[in-house]
Amino acid sequence: MKDLSRISVVLPSLDPDEKLNAVIDGLLEYGFTDIILVNDGSRAENLHYFTDAAAAHPEIHFLQHEVNRGKGAALKTAFTWFLANRPDGLGVITVDGDNQHHPADTRACCERMLETGHIVLGCRDFTLDNVPARSRFGNHVTSVVFRIFVGMTVSDTQTGLRAIPRDALEILTAVKGDRFEYETNMLLAMKDNGLPFEEVKIRTVYIEENASSHFHPIRDSWRIYKLILAHFFRYTLSSLTSALVDTAAFSLLGWVLRHWMEGFALTAAAGVGARIISSQLNFFLNKKLVFRSHASTGRAMLRYYCLAIPQMCIQVLLTQGVYALLHIADSQYVLRTLIYAVVMAVLYVVSYMIQQCWVFAPRKRGSQTQGVKS
């Protein structure tokens, strides 16, 4: 068993009950010696759970917010305190105060982090019978959306059990968000900064149908999905802008070049010229505004054109194939342009996923393992 003396447990809580004592007792029993307990503006009648625990256990350092600021703010308060006051600390592990994280799983996540130096997510199994239907459905949808629109495979996007090494913590403390959306922003920041992570399977515990959770299904879900879909929304705007430029250039070049070319040659020349113009605009919009990538411009541009050139060829061939199939004449400029735009729209979703996962992906800070350790 590994020494956990240089690992701090971050334990945020709002209006706790007696389960908080059980959480603390379990952590101490499993070898944790430093607990950062954060009161996130609890009501007066619940304060004694914090003060009693802090008085009874010298292993606890007690922090508090005068008013409720949200789970994200509570986590960042603890992270900031850890970085300033635990210079020899190797990392932290975040734990929820409702006793739904078994201390054995908490320890397992920490030991895995110490072995690999990676962020470790303790992930529940949502296929089990004891999982509430709304939790099973919500996590499944969020995981699918995350995989498609963010390019990350995370089986439990809302897990509160996260072991974070010190170097990653310095990055994640600066992430925006004060409430439940902070944990989603944390995952997005892990992707943007190339922070390696992996999953460890943990017990799936729901007490009283998760009644003690402070998660607001509509309000907090909206905050989370807004963050996840932001990349794709910006990509759509970038694509529409580039598509308008591309389509206008294709139409103009086709009108000009029709005096010297016809058939496939006309389609190819107009398509290539339009794509050269629009691709430069699209590259810089995507790099700076959509993916906000810090990847090397030269490397990203090389990858971008390794994608864009085959895509352009496929687009031209598909467009010309539709023209031939439907017997569209060279003089039917409006219809030709419409077909070209439709083909371009069909290809852009696949292009988005490749750009996100490869073209503008940051260099990883080590081997990223998204597998599951039992």
Predicted regions and their residues:
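Hydrophobic helical membrane-anchoring modules
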Residues: 1-3, 175-258, 275-279, 286-310, ...
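Conserved short acidic donor-positioning loop in nucleotide-sugar-dependent glycosyltransferases
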Residues: 15, 40-42, 69, 78
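Short, well-formed alpha-helical segments that are part of the catalytic scaffolds
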Residues: 15-29, 45
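A conserved acidic beta->alpha catalytic loop
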Residues: 39-50, 67, 99-100
